[in-house]
């Protein structure tokens, strides 16, 4: 499970056996969400609204880097 970033209590990662579309998993405490990288669509969410909002901001800011790391790992 490659961890891409740890920030503000959030852990941004993907699993070694992922599939398209490119997406990232985010955990904070016991809460988690899954965000598609290209569209920033939330496909699963079990986070508090303020944490989800912050997670989306962080993913948007790091979007290009997360996509690059996805491509490096899976290609």
Briefly describe each language-model feature range.
Residues 1-4:
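Local beta-strand/beta-hairpin segments that build beta-sheet-rich folds
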Residues 7-13:
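Charge-dense, helix-prone N-terminal extensions
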Residues 15-47:
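A short, structured beta-strand/loop element
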Residues 47-75:
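C-terminal structural segments of small proteins and small subunits
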């Amino acid at each position: 499970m490659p961890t891409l970033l740890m920030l503000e209590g959030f852990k941004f990662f993907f699993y070694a056996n992922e599939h398209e579309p490119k997406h990232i998993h985010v955990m904070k405490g016991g809460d988690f969400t899954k965000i598609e990288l290209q569209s920033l669509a939330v496909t699963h969410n079990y986070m508090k609204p303020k944490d989800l909002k912050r997670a989306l901001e962080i993913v948007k800011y790091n979007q290009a880097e997360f996509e690059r790391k996805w491509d490096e790992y899976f290609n």
